[in-house]
UniProtKB/Swiss-Prot annotation:
InterPro entries: HemC, Porphobilin_deaminase_cofac_BS, Porphobilin_deaminase_N, Porphobilinogen_deaminase_C, Porphobilinogen_deaminase_C_sf. It comes from Legionella pneumophila (strain Paris). Keywords: Porphyrin biosynthesis, Transferase. This is Porphobilinogen deaminase. It is an enzyme of class 2 (transferase). Monomer. The porphobilinogen subunits are added to the dipyrromethane group. Its EC number is 2.5.1.61. GO terms for cellular component: cytoplasm.
Length: 309
C-alpha cells in the first residue's frame, strides 16, 4: 500500500465515530504503517432526526452525504451500520466488506420493568421503528407506542426523564458504546425478529478502487457477509426501505445449514405474514428468492400496500 492518507467518511454521532475508529484500529493492526484520517459528516438523516424518517425519505438519508464524498473522492471508504444502507447502491459504489456481526437483537430498556411481560397495560414504549412497533403490538396490543428519536444518549435521557416506561434500542449500539448495563432484556427473536443486517458494520468504497478493496479485504467476515447479503436480497425484493414493518434474519445452524426467517406485518401488528427457509449455504440466493416468493404468495405485497407511503 502506498504512503497516501486514507480517509474514512463517517457520520458525526458518537456511535458512528466509535464504529469508524473501530474500523481504523482494525486496519492499522493489519497495516501498521497506514495513515488514516476520519472525515466526520452531518447527514440528511441527522438533520431530520426530529422528524419522521418515513416522510423525510427513509434510511438512505444516513448515508447519502458519505456516498457523495466517496464519489467525488474526498473519502476513500465509508463505514456504515449496514442496516442503514438502502437496498440499491449508487452506480460506482460497492459494499467491499462486512465486518464480523455483533449482537443482532433488540433490547428493552426500562428503569422499572424487567421484561416485556412485566409492562403494565397502556405502558408507553419509545421507538421510531415500524418493525419494532408492529412486532411489539403483535405481542401485546395493549402497549402505547410513542415516537423516539435522537442518538443513543438522547434516547436514554428521554427515558430517564419519565417520558416513557420503556424504550427499544439495538443491543449492538449499546454494547459498542459501553452502555450494555442499561439493557433490561434482550428481546427473543420469536417476539422481535431483527431488521435486515442489524448488528453488522459494512465498509463501502468505489467499485473501481482495487487498492482500497485489497486494503479492507481482511476485515470481511465471510459468514457475516453471507448472512447479511442474503437478508439484503430479500429486503430488496420486498421494496428495500425502512417504510415497511419488515424483519429478516439469517443464521448458520449447528448442522452448517443456512436458516432464513422473515416476516411482514401491518402497523398495529394485527396481521402478520412470515416464512422460514433452510438449505445449503452455497444455495443462499436460491433460499432468499424462495423466501421472498413464499411471502409474496401468502400476500405480503397486499399487506404492505396498506402501509402509508
Amino acid at each position: 500500500m502506498s504512503a497516501k492518507i486514507i480517509r474514512i467518511a463517517t457520520r458525526q454521532s458518537p456511535l458512528a465515530l466509535w464504529q469508524a475508529n473501530h474500523v481504523r484500529e482494525m486496519l492499522v493492526k493489519q497495516w501498521p504503517n497506514l495513515s488514516i484520517e476520519l472525515l466526520p459528516m452531518i447527514t440528511s438523516g441527522d438533520r431530520f432526526l426530529k422528524d419522521k424518517l418515513l416522510s423525510a425519505g427513509g434510511k438512505g438519508l444516513f448515508v447519502k452525504e458519505l456516498e457523495e464524498a466517496l464519489l467525488d473522492k474526498r473519502a476513500d471508504l465509508a463505514v456504515h451500520s449496514t442496516k442503514d444502507m438502502p437496498a440499491q447502491l449508487p452506480d460506482g459504489l460497492s459494499l467491499a466488506a462486512i465486518c464480523k456481526r455483533d449482537n443482532p437483537f433488540d433490547a428493552l430498556i426500562s428503569p422499572r420493568f424487567k421484561s416485556l411481560d412485566a409492562l403494565p397495560k397502556n405502558a408507553i414504549i419509545g421507538t421510531s421503528s415500524l418493525r419494532r412497533q408492529s412486532q411489539l403490538l403483535a405481542y401485546n396490543p395493549n402497549l402505547q407506542i410513542k415516537t423516539l428519536r435522537g442518538n443513543i444518549h438522547t434516547r436514554l435521557s428521554k427515558l430517564e426523564s419519565g417520558e416513557y416506561q420503556a424504550i427499544i434500542l439495538a443491543a449492538a449500539g449499546l454494547e459498542r458504546m459501553g452502555l450494555a448495563h442499561h439493557i433490561t432484556q434482550l428481546i427473543p427473536d420469536d417476539i422481535m425478529l431483527p431488521t435486515c443486517a442489524q448488528g453488522a458494520l459494512c465498509i463501502e468504497c468505489r467499485t473501481d478502487d482495487l487498492e482500497i478493496q485489497e486494503l479492507i479485504h481482511g476485515l470481511n467476515d465471510p459468514i457475516s457477509a453471507l448472512c447479511v447479503h442474503t437478508e439484503r436480497r430479500v429486503n430488496a425484493k420486498l421494496g428495500g426501505n425502512c417504510h415497511i414493518p419488515f424483519a429478516v434474519y439469517c443464521t448458520i445452524t449447528a448442522e452448517k445449514l443456512l436458516l432464513l426467517r422473515a416476516k411482514v406485518l401491518n402497523l398495529d401488528g394485527s396481521q402478520m405474514i412470515d416464512d422460514e427457509q433452510q438449505g445449503k449455504i452455497e444455495e443462499a440466493e436460491i433460499i432468499a428468492d424462495r423466501c421472498t416468493e413464499s411471502l409474496m404468495t401468502k400476500g405480503a405485497m397486499s399487506l404492505l400496500s396498506t402501509i402509508p407511503s
